Amino acid sequence: MRIKRRFTKAGRSAYAGIRFTTRTSEIRNPDGTVVFSNGSVEVPEGWSQVASDIIAQKYFRKAGIPAQLERIEEKGVPEFLWRSRASRDHGEGGTTVGETGARQVFDRLAGTWAYWGWKGGYFSSQKDARAYFDEMRYMLATQRAAPNSPQWFNTGLHWAYGIDGPSQGHHYVDYRTGRLTRSGSAYEHPQPHACFIQSCADDLVNDGGIMDLWVREARLFKYGSGTGTNFSRLRGEGEALSGGGRSSGLMGFLKIGDRAAGAIKSGGTTRRAAKMVICDADHPDVESFINWKVREEQKVASLVAGSKMHEARLNEIFAAINTWDGVHEDAIDPAANPALKAALRAAKGCAIPEAYVKRVLDYARQGYTSIEFPTQNTDWDSEAYGTVSGQNSNNSVRVTDAFLEAVADDADWALIRRTDGKVAKVLKARDLWEQIGHAAWACADPGIQYHDTVNAWHTCPEDGEIRGSNPCSEYMFLDDTACNLASINLLAFYRDGRFMAEDYIHATRLWTLTLEISVMMAQFPSKEIARRSYDFRTLGLGFANIGGLLMTMGHGYDSVEGRALCGVLTAVMTGVAYSTSAEISREVGPFPGYGKNASHMLRVIRNHRNAAYGMADGYEGLAVRPVPLDHANCPDAKLSELAKSSWDEALSLGERHGYRNAQATVIAPTGTIGLVMDCDTTGIEPDFALVKFKKLAGGGYFKIINRSVPAALGTLGYSTSQIEDIVSYAVGHGTFRSAPGINHDSLADLGFGAKELDRLEAASPSAFDIRFVFNHWTLGERFCTDTLGISASQLSDQGFDLLRHLGFG
């Protein structure tokens, strides 16, 4: 393929014009102790402290890089793409270091993609490979786009540094022969895919079965990826087993997987485990599945309340004994000690087990005066939540059109046994729907997946139905396939009051190629996933920061203009991605599964094109028609036309050459990579807050307005002075001088001196709320007690409001 330069120039560094600076990155515990510190993090000067922290703390390879490297000459490969390894002078057990500069990471990623792209025949010449290498590095450095986290973690460790390790049981398909091959090392073929869908057979210990799935999941979690599985093939509780027993059912096995994921999340090298669990609406155990997290969260509530109640009531028993002023033996006798009798009655009334009451009385006889009973709390990472199950996955119920029609008609719904297909139970569809709604309201799970709608847009139905998704549900395809993601930062393509459509299209083309190359170079956790991912080559290009872009342009997120522009941008990206896929297919051939699915895929592409033209009718094979593009309300006429032409090209090129990829785009949440790109909003969601806290390089935080707000106000016609006033109002003035109500004069009347006022002024700019400034840590305990007349018990009370005490209600 021919690669044009748009951001860089031949003969110049990819980083020309980009200034770099050195920053300090730290992680501190709440008590101030340092967990991680790197004082020499080199990043582009325009990057925020948050973005700098993300790349330093999450994406830098922290150890194992040989201090001395040498290039390995490789026949037929351009010199700038030669691999590196520890130099012969380095020796066994030589000094190793970690990455300290962002350029090392950018070079590692882009170099690896270019290396494998060259070997796979994706570039027409060395000039094109060099252009690709430079353009990709530039986009990474300028935060125009980013690949999913596993790429940052794994890609290029072998190519750039010669890092390797023993095989972890992965497989890949050799791009030269098409032969399935067991990986001989951990990193030569990296694991760049974030999203996996895995199957699970109704088999306990064989390959492809239940226990094998936990091993496959562990391989994914170890390298930072996530996985989803539809478990509906597993028989329900009480169904017959071949050996004559009864099945423990779906939930028993889900709890094993949940516990395994919970253990791996804290022992892995990169991040927490990401896991999706799916159950069909007709599974015999679906009701237990729906209410799983609801019941577990009720257990947490019981643990928290019960532990606090035990701690209070048991110590009340001790208090009743300790305050007795008579004979010691009578102190432990409820007949003689009325206070003890009342305390015992209170404990019994709260259902404190008699064994614990007896234990306290025995302790008292031995001279103990109190008991430490560990109390729990509702923090998501607490011991209480670690005790219950169901906390390590997203849960979804998969519903069909038939189920939704049964809900609408208030009809019966049958739950079907997996062993013989007979009815296990009949209930009202609305009852099941109500359970789903209540559970989602109570604990945010389960979600809903619309089986028939998803499969109506399936490009490869000849190879089976789509039954599941990855953990975040943006990727839906065949079982035992994988998707590697990348996101384009939309706001980075908005300059001087207009969206740079040509730059956006250029970036879309190059990132589509990058994701395709990543399929070729990847290894996978099982033979089945390696084969099917190679055969279908699904990609996950998406965007981030749509909320920030719309705000900067002055369009409401929920406005007709905002929705129209979002739709058009999505259409352009997806159309160009499929056009690029067809161009790649022209050079190296379509994906192996394309032949028998060609008519289906072209039907899906025609439906996309129809929607891109804004058509209400004319769709093929769809029971539910999509919402078409709203060209009339799109504020950018050029983008509107590009949305149509990109799909014209996607269809015409596909009809001639086929497609290299069965899917090309998704809209992912872009959590961590959204932060490394300094996105105001991640994924497709609106901004969650106009005012935020910016992390400072030297530590601490500073209250700021979302950087899109001043730009949006300027676009809407506000003057500079008006914008300053609005920003100050939103952020707060950070001072009590001349403030209404609470100011230096009103505080001086209450006894505040110059020292106390100076302390308030110093604390106010970074305060989340004015109440967080007025406390004894800021003002001093002696001032609060001696001058303001506040008791020590009031100061230690977490619910005490000092401002209200001073009369500022």
Annotated model-derived regions:
Residues 1-809:
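Extended catalytic cores of very large enzyme megasubunits
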